[in-house]
């Protein structure tokens, strides 16, 4: 069974995407699921959280160049530029580059409670003109670079090694994140209940919905080549609130947000009747927003990143319930 691929994203920054990626990954790893987390943010926040917990290196800046996602992207970008063409991509006649990265870029968090189940691919911001945003800009010069992420995952044998692959996406859309959009099976949107999010989240969903068509209509790609490397477009699992503050206007914002998503004619997995008990479902009802939320506690973020200092990647109890519900949805949908 292939690993399920899920990305966490939102156009708005500061809503807890990275914290949520790590926390949900950690809770699932605690339950015995094999998790791979991939850091796509140029700020490398997820990598900083994880970096001190693998042994051998004291901080992210000490990781060698060929132990990062940056190196893998650079490697495949140069391969596509100099050796691969659309014919080889279509037929699958791709050289095995896994030998250059397989033993180098996947790290396991050594915290004993995870029993080797919590893993990550770090990104780094120390390389001049080779941070992830720099690489994404260079990738955009050749549309075939959109196939880099599925190639990396395939040659790392990720489908055989992991149950779930989590992508921590930055608040932007470029060829790198679009590659992740298309390679993913599902996505989750952490957000806060405010006026900006009421329209920002639906805009983000609209962008994701349009990406597949964008590349299918490109004359150098087309639907057949896309289908050879990507499956169907990803499904929205649902939206959940982070940094929740209890006030009278909060439900108003959430109600409008849920209604705006409804108008997109996008059916989230959460909107299925069998998950009605996971949603707001009393006097106030939602279809796409979980009723469980992460309370506004700065300690959640600090305890997640506390690993930078204490060599201890911590789970926070506030994420236990939402993690269990997401896992139940994923397991139910793949039966």
Task: Indicate where each model-derived feature is located.
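P-loop NTP-binding core
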Residues: 1-335
